[in-house]
């Protein structure tokens, strides 16, 4: 239908009518009512390949990977929108403007800004476990205050994407001169993000090379 589109470059589909989206494995799982391992086997058979036998550990890792991507996608989308539209974030926009970075650059690199006292953890914890959110590297537990803190609060954020254009980590920069805070920070390494294996803007470089 006209509302259904497939992005060959990023290897995902999206239906604007139902908001359903995902990769080829998601599509087969939804349309055939398969589990992940069954979808892989089915596609391998269609391609004339010997399928890999997925274990329960493989399926659990795939589930964790999807949760990880969803957390980062929601996080980046929310704070990108806030930077573009929230009137109280004019200081962040002015900071970028003084460095010749306007709305076009903000959209191109999907920059965002996080206020000093954010509360996005409360929104995400309705969908994900506290352990999963901490494992993403975006949050940590302040044991003295017994509360979860957003690692990039008070910073401009720059998504670090995988080669498919999906955010898997962040770079952050403070916009105020505070000697007790590091000017730049990056996401810590996680089970799904290894600093030596990902380059900033690698997905954009791939587009330019095609």
Q: Model regions: which residues?
A:
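Terminal peptide-recognition signature
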Residues: 15, 28, 96, 158, ...
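Conserved active-site segments centered on acidic
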Residues: 38-91
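Short, conserved phosphate-binding/catalytic loop or strand-edge motifs used
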Residues: 11, 45-49, 93-98, 103-119
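A general alpha-helix detector
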Residues: 23-27, 74-78, 91-95, 119-120
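Phosphate-handling DNA/RNA-contact segment within nucleic-acid enzymes
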Residues: 60-67, 74, 115-210
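N-terminal single-stranded DNA-binding subdomain of primase/primase-helicase replication proteins
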Residues: 1-33, 41, 54, 67
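Helical mechanochemical/support elements of P-loop NTPase systems and associated helical scaffolds
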Residues: 24, 35, 39, 92, ...
């Amino acid at each position: 239908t006209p509302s259904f589109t497939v992005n060959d470059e990023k290897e995902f589909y999206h239906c604007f009518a139902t908001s359903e989206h995902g990769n080829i494995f998601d599509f087969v799982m939804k349309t055939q009512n398969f589990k992940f391992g069954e979808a892989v086997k089915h596609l391998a058979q269609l391609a004339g390949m010997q399928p890999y036998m997925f274990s329960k550990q493989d399926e659990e890792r795939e589930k964790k990977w999807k949760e990880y991507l969803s957390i980062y996608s929601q996080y980046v989308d929310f704070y990108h929108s806030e930077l573009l539209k929230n009137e109280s974030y004019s200081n962040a926009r002015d900071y970028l403007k003084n460095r010749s970075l306007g709305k076009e650059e903000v959209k191109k690199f999907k920059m965002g800004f996080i206020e000093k006292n954010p509360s996005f953890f409360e929104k995400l914890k309705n969908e994900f476990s506290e352990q999963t959110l901490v494992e993403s590297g975006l949050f940590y537990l302040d044991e003295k205050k017994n509360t979860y803190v957003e690692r990039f609060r008070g910073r401009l954020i720059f998504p670090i994407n995988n080669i498919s254009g999906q955010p898997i980590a962040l770079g952050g920069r403070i916009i105020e001169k505070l000697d007790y805070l590091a000017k730049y920070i990056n996401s810590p390494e996680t089970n799904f993000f290894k600093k030596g294996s990902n380059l900033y803007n690698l997905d954009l470089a791939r587009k330019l090379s095609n």
